[in-house]
Amino acid sequence: MTSAVVVGTQWGDEGKGKITDFLGQNADAIARYQGGDNAGHTIKLGEDTYHLQLIPSGIFNSDKVSVIGNGVVVNPKSLVGELRGLADKNVDTSQLKLSDRAHVILPYHIKLDSLQEAAKGDQKIGTTNRGIGPAYMDKAARSGIRVADLLDKDLFATKLKQNLAEKNALFTKIYEVEALDFDSIFEEYYQYGQELKQYVCDTSVVLNDVLDQKGNVLFEGAQGILLDIDQGTYPFVTSSNPAGGVSTGSGVGASRIDEVVGVAKAYTSRVGDGPFPTELFDETGDFIRQAGHEYGTVTGRPRRIGWFDTVVLRHSKRVAGLTQLCLNCVDVLTGLKTLKICVAYELDGERIDRYPASLSELARCTPIYEELPGWDEDITGVKTLEELPVNARRYVERLQELVDLPLATFAVGPDRDQTNILKAIW
């Protein structure tokens, strides 16, 4: 029996889906435990490319159980759409399990998300306008609607009427926009619930049963640790806990978690606003963006690009208890003459190794870089560290030294067979 968490160590988009799919080959269950359909991940299998936002990456392993845990906020419309899309490509989804305790995103959450973001003006945080934050707000306020409620026609109607009365008052009196209609939302979303009913169960029982039977469980974190609402660059963060939310979001106790696998790119990217100390604004950043196809899976927005930041990685290692590191996109850096690694920050004339909580301090931080020579050789077929060109190997090993984590895998391309194992996780 082994349980492992796969979590992004930067600002999301690190390639967690690929690693989860790769590691999921030896797992008996794969589970999402936080976030919502703002967390796009891309899986490439042969000639087919799949873009998923809610369904765990493990769905492509038909003999595995795929779980959407209670900590996820679920847009039923998005989930039904994903399921239909997979069915169209003959992907078996019978092993999907949806927590009856997961909270539901409804149209008023999405509308409120957009209105709240627009009202912030220059202080906007870069939300994906998917209703994630407002859904978590309702959850904390104890007025949310859960999947179990969605399946109960009378209870769903009662709760929806109560919530719409409150939200429509906000829309008409505060934001001065049109109210939402109860009947259309109720009919549409109740039908979604009926379509999802076959997947709904107590997923905590499912996951703990797998562990009790000596099976392997892989937990898939969404976004990244620097987007964690507590440990990230607040308020430019998501509304959940990628770093430590696995137990509360899955119903599997902390004592049953064995490994925490951090995923990072060989550089850094970020979507949306917020601090980014190593951000590049020159042709080097453009080169990496183009070479790495750095555009958001969900939004299509160009990602911001920067050098690898070991201050960020050490922060992530500490707050999430990382035990191993998976390094992706090493091949993207091919062709750059010089590579830089941020090893510390300078703040008001002082060298610091911590990641500041204060946005004003972060704005005054200047990265301290270590420079390494780049490489021109094609590395997309490399299978071992020893096969890498000298400069590429030196770069990978230097990152590992600075972060002080064992390197479990390194990837030299998007395909499953381009992810190379250095240390077994299972």
UniProtKB/Swiss-Prot annotation:
SUPFAM superfamilies annotated for this entry? P-loop containing nucleoside triphosphate hydrolases
Where along the chain is the active site annotated?
Answer: D13 (proton acceptor), H41 (proton donor)
What function does this protein fulfil? Plays an important role in the de novo pathway of purine nucleotide biosynthesis. Catalyzes the first committed step in the biosynthesis of AMP from IMP.
Q: Which reaction does it catalyse?
A: IMP + L-aspartate + GTP = N(6)-(1,2-dicarboxyethyl)-AMP + GDP + phosphate + 2 H(+)
Q: Which organism is it from?
A: Latilactobacillus sakei subsp. sakei (strain 23K) (Lactobacillus sakei subsp. sakei)
Q: How does it assemble?
A: Homodimer.
According to its record, what are the GO cellular component terms? Answer: cytoplasm
What is the protein name given in its UniProt record? Answer: Adenylosuccinate synthetase
**Quick one: which pathway?**
Purine metabolism; AMP biosynthesis via de novo pathway; AMP from IMP: step 1/2
- Pfam families documented for this protein: Adenylsucc_synt
Any one GO BP annotation for this protein: IMP metabolic process
- Binding-site positions, GTP: 12-18, 40-42, 303, 329-331, 411-413
Q: Which UniProt keywords apply?
A: Cytoplasm, GTP-binding, Ligase, Magnesium, Metal-binding, Nucleotide-binding, Purine biosynthesis
Q: Where does IMP bind?
A: D13, E14, G15, K16, N38, A39, G40, H41, T128, R142, Q223, T238, R301
The EC number of this protein is: 6.3.4.4
Q: Which cofactor(s) does the record list?
A: Mg(2+)
- Matches recorded under CDD domains: AdSS
